[in-house]
């Protein structure tokens, strides 16, 4: 049986996302576990167009965009020390973390 832990990180700021991935990778490497990544996933760009004026001047518009950056880390065959190390990692406030445990047969 082969177990894997998949960690997906999401953030609007790529610098804080890269810092969080470095902290997680260094914590996992201290436990001598096999880690793949960080794998950069495609970023999502949301664009919004709004009128500048609330009443007239339809041709005068303003555009905004928001970028969501994502990374994937895969830890192969984790042991209890890896789970303990991951629970002690302190990450930045703007980073969203999703952890999945996948068991293969």
Swiss-Prot record:
Cross-referenced Pfam families: Ribosomal_S10
Signal peptide: none
One annotated GO biological process: translation
Gene3D superfamilies hit by this protein: Ribosomal protein S10 domain
InterPro entries reported in the protein's UniProt record: Ribosomal_uS10 (IPR001848), Ribosomal_uS10_dom (IPR027486), Ribosomal_uS10_dom_sf (IPR036838)
GO terms of molecular function: structural constituent of ribosome; tRNA binding
Role summary: Involved in the binding of tRNA to the ribosomes.
Oligomer status and interactors: Part of the 30S ribosomal subunit.
Listed PANTHER family: 30S RIBOSOMAL PROTEIN S10 FAMILY MEMBER
Name of the protein in its database record: Small ribosomal subunit protein uS10
Species in which this protein is naturally found: Rickettsia rickettsii (strain Sheila Smith)
């Amino acid at each position: 049986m082969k177990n894997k832990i998949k960690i997906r990180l999401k953030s609007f700021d790529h610098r804080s996302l890269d810092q969080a991935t470095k902290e997680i990778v260094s914590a996992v490497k201290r436990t001598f576990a096999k880690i793949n990544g960080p794998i950069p996933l495609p970023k999502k760009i949301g664009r919004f167009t709004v009128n500048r004026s609330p009443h007239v001047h339809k041709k005068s518009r303003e555009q905004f965009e928001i970028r969501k950056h994502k990374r994937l880390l895969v830890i192969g065959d984790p042991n209890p020390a890896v789970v303990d190390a991951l629970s002690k990692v302190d990450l930045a406030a703007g980073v969203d973390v999703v952890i999945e445990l996948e068991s293969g047969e």
